[in-house]
Amino acid sequence: MWGFVDCTRYYLSLGLPKVVLHDASLVVGAHEKVGLLIPPGEGKSTIIRMLAGVEPPDSGIVLRDDGGWPLGYAGALQPTLTGDENVRNVALMVGLDPDEFSMWCADFSELGEAYFEPLRLYSGSMRGRLAFAASLGIPASTYLADDRLAVGDERFRQKCEVTLAERLQSAGLIFVASNPRLTKEACERHGVVSRGKIIECGSHEEAEELFTQNFRDNAGEEIADEELASFDLA
């Protein structure tokens, strides 16, 4: 089970709280595909980091199990190590055979000889391909996605999408995005993050309408003065 129970997360911006979540709740069951729409810069990455256990909430409970993995997550990759060394470390981290996992990642990423070079020599697109190869090679119970489900050129993106679709036949997805089209195609449950609250919607169309009307023109709006008292600004 994944999600949030009365979770609050904020950070200070120019002395005022920039709210990501404020007493927000959401429960996601096994194998569910949930899309949450949120404007750019309003906390997509923070929400994913909280679900992944990388960043704690200021208050409340984060629900998570041990079988989740952030899609395209590059935080575990070290720039001084080669692509091969990096994915072997990831394999050991999640309990997979390093040799088999490295072979899979080398084939999927299509990096050629660069696979055996240090990551600091990679371009952004090369790092993205390696990160997605590593993510899709892990048989996660739930994938956590921050605004994208694929990387690279059109052919490689299609390859990512096909492989992810295969994985999602027996796995869940929590997809936090700013593009309603992406969540429509990938998710079955839909919601919107509004002023720190997670609002569940009955359909993608309802979520898109709420997102478009209430957020695209009001991204970055500060919370009401009466709510400031609930945050410790010391």
Give the location of each predicted region.
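Conserved beta-strand-loop-alpha-helix hinge in the C-terminal portion
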Residues: K197-A224
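ABC ATPase nucleotide-binding domain signature region
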Residues: A30-L92
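ABC-family P-loop ATPase nucleotide-binding domains
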Residues: Y10, W69-V162
